[in-house]
């Protein structure tokens, strides 16, 4: 059904976070600090992996791409949110809104596929250790990353092109801090049945299929760990998978809470808070999870500091 007062929308208004005006300064400082830590922390992970030859392995190859994706995902939404807090200008041009939506979907999907590739890498390393170097060659790693980029781009582009066909009503207020696809569809005056079909089929598949692959990989890993002949083998396997499993639990736990649990009357605020979790909090915590729980990363960090100390003398 078409709404009244249909018009051509040139810009949208983002309502930002559900916080009181007197809290703006506190939250601006908080989110600015978290964003800077996210960028610097993930850049440090990338730098360590590039500079330290001990980290030139498939697992850290995928981790470097995940760190870059985390930086990009936060950069799609957080700077605009901070600018709105500082200037009180909540408007965003139509083209800018569609562009933000595209890259948000793109990097969210890319996170899913990279986490799946990392789970497969851990599966091969633990379940088939003697064949690990034979299977996880550079060509396969590059192929997995390339396919992840292509699938993410294709899915994001399909949603963007379908959205571009829609008309929007006079109501241009988005109850979110970024241009969320579902929120945009609610503002449309056009028939959105095709958009909803793509979301519930392709969109859901992009979330559920990688998660199923990760669960299957860790199911095989769990069986292998239980069959390990010594306690040392079990602890080594757990330390190898611990960081990745923590990130997977944090990321997909938020996604499941957002899309699969029953909605409440404050569903709009719930969506905003959940979005903050996987666009701000998860990218922020990932470098700490990998540096605190991974001895290789901590060793590379120590070697980098020692090298810097020697050069400064």
Curated annotation (Swiss-Prot):
Gene Ontology cellular component annotations, sorted alphabetically: plasma membrane
Pfam families named in the record: 7tm_4 (PF13853)
Glycosylation sites: 5
Regions annotated as coiled coil: none
Highest taxon in the source lineage: Eukaryota
Role this protein plays: Odorant receptor.
Protein name: Olfactory receptor 1J4
Gene name tied to this protein: OR1J4
């Amino acid at each position: 059904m078409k709404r009244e007062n249909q018009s051509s929308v040139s810009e949208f208004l983002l309502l930002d976070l559900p916080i009181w005006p007197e809290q703006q300064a506190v939250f601006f400082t908080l989110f600015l600090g978290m964003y800077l830590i996210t960028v610097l922390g993930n850049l440090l992970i990338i730098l360590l992996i590039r500079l330290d030859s001990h980290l030139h392995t498939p697992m850290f190859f995928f981790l470097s791409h995940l760190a870059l994706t985390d930086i990009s995902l936060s950069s799609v939404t957080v700077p605009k949110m901070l600018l709105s807090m500082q200037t009180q200008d909540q408007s965003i041009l139509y083209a800018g809104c569609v562009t933000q939506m595209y890259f948000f979907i793109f990097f969210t999907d890319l996170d899913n596929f990279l986490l799946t590739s990392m789970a497969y890498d851990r599966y091969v390393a633990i379940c088939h250790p003697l064949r690990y170097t034979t299977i996880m060659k550079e060509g396969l790693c590059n192929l997995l990353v390339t396919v992840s980029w292509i699938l993410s781009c294709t899915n994001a582009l399909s949603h963007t092109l379908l959205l571009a066909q829609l008309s929007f009503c006079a109501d241009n207020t988005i109850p979110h801090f970024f241009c969320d696809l579902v929120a945009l569809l609610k503002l449309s005056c056009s028939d959105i049945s095709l958009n909803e079909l793509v979301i519930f089929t392709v969109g859901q598949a992009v979330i559920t299929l990688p998660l199923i692959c990760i669960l299957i990989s860790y199911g095989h890993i769990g069986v292998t760990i239980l069959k390990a002949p010594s306690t040392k083998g079990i602890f080594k396997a757990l330390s190898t998978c611990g960081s990745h499993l923590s990130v997977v639990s944090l990321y997909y736990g938020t996604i499941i809470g957002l899309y699969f649990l029953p909605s409440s009357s404050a569903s709009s605020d719930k969506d905003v808070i959940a979005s903050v979790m996987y666009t701000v909090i998860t990218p922020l915590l990932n470098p700490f999870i990998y540096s605190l729980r991974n001895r290789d990363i901590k060793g590379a960090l120590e070697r980098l500091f020692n090298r810097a100390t020697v050069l400064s003398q």
